[in-house]
């Protein structure tokens, strides 16, 4: 607890909240080009091969983005749309690739939660 004299000398500084997705620079999404597409393993206690991509954004940042859904067509030089949103069991992955836009196609045979995976309504 500061003394009154200390508060007179220098005021309390307001706490500034930091953004969780700095590479987007306040934009809802950003376009980028995949530089590397690979799989990585989650931290304990989970076990899987999660599909991720290194993406160079138009803002100049090089980020790691998660590719959601079952199966994907992303490869090197694919142009993708990136949104914020971390993957809890992959350290350092703070972005998601948006399926169904640009070069990332929607998930095949998806019936439920289609809007999150870029799938049109089946006939």
From Swiss-Prot:
First-listed, main subcellular location of the protein, grouped into a coarse class: plastid
GO cellular component: chloroplast; small ribosomal subunit
Biological role: With S4 and S5 plays an important role in translational accuracy. Located at the interface of the 30S and 50S subunits.
InterPro entries: NA-bd_OB-fold, Ribosomal_uS12, Ribosomal_uS12_bac
Gene Ontology molecular function: rRNA binding; structural constituent of ribosome
Protein name: Small ribosomal subunit protein uS12c
GO biological process, one term: translation
Subcellular location: Plastid, Chloroplast
Gene from which this protein is expressed: rps12
Family: Belongs to the universal ribosomal protein uS12 family.
Organism the protein comes from: Huperzia lucidula (Shining clubmoss)
UniProt entry keywords in alphabetical sequence: Chloroplast, Plastid, Ribonucleoprotein, Ribosomal protein, RNA-binding, rRNA-binding
Quaternary state and interactors: Part of the 30S ribosomal subunit.
SUPFAM superfamilies linked: Nucleic acid-binding proteins
